[in-house]
């Protein structure tokens, strides 16, 4: 029973942190403010997380688990190259849209002034997503014998940059300009250009 309560409190702390990141854009979250939001003392926060960095790591673990597991499902369920790319980008954009506070962690905005390893971990996550996109694009060349005009690594970088740009706009607009807005039309254009190359 005690373990269940502990997990529940940890999750509650992370949910409050994500909520504060959403409702206080551009502001740094202190442990004092977070403790007040959770309704506990700062000491109680530290019983569940040894540091504020560990709290952010908890959010990053949630991001990694959510995105990477779903990307694996996309890879298993879908075989078409362009559809795979579309679904991976759409997943990233929808995840950011549905988790506005957490999108600030993805963007790095919420990590300014925090431990460098947090930014490195988010950067590594984007590196994994870019590698996955590159692999998807390379498989098209192997399957069909025809590649793209640009190197797959450059294309993967470009596709991920589009998604990262949409997330940055979402944060800059204080969550008003949805990252998925017009994505289907924009993807249609991008896909057409890729297939013509």
From Swiss-Prot:
GO terms for cellular component: bacterial nucleoid; cytoplasm. SUPFAM superfamilies: Homeodomain-like. Coiled coil: none annotated. The keyword Membrane does not apply. GO terms for biological process: cell division; negative regulation of division septum assembly. Residues 30-49 bind DNA. It is found in: Cytoplasm, Nucleoid. Belongs to the nucleoid occlusion factor SlmA family. One of its GO terms (molecular function) is sequence-specific DNA binding. It comes from Shewanella amazonensis (strain ATCC BAA-1098 / SB2B). This is Nucleoid occlusion factor SlmA. Homodimer. Interacts with FtsZ. Gene3D superfamilies: Tetracycline Repressor, domain 2 (1.10.357.10). InterPro entries: Homeodomain-like_sf, HTH-type_Tx_Regulator, HTH_TetR, NO_SlmA, SlmA-like_C. Residues 7-67 form the HTH tetR-type domain. Keywords: Cell cycle, Cell division, Cytoplasm, DNA-binding. Required for nucleoid occlusion (NO) phenomenon, which prevents Z-ring formation and cell division over the nucleoid. Acts as a DNA-associated cell division inhibitor that binds simultaneously chromosomal DNA and FtsZ, and disrupts the assembly of FtsZ polymers. SlmA-DNA-binding sequences (SBS) are dispersed on non-Ter regions of the chromosome, preventing FtsZ polymerization at these regions.
């Amino acid at each position: 029973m005690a373990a269940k309560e502990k997990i529940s409190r940890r999750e509650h702390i992370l949910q409050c942190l994500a909520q504060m990141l959403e409702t206080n854009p551009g502001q740094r979250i202190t442990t004092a403010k977070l403790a007040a939001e959770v309704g506990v003392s700062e000491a109680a926060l530290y019983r569940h997380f040894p540091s504020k960095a560990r709290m952010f790591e908890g959010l990053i673990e949630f991001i990694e688990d959510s995105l990477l597991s779903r990307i694996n499902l996309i890879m298993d369920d879908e075989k078409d190259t362009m559809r795979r790319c579309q679904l991976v980008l759409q997943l990233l954009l929808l995840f950011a849209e549905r988790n506005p506070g957490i999108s600030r962690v993805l963007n790095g905005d919420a990590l300014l002034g925090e431990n460098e390893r947090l930014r490195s971990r988010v950067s590594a996550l984007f590196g994994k997503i870019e590698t996955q996109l590159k692999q998807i694009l390379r498989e098209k060349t192997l399957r069909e014998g025809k590649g793209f005009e640009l190197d797959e690594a450059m294309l993967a970088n470009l596709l991920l940059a589009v998604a990262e740009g949409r997330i940055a706009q979402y944060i800059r607009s204080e969550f008003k300009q949805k990252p998925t807005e017009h994505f289907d039309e924009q993807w249609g254009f991008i896909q057409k250009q890729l297939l013509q190359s």
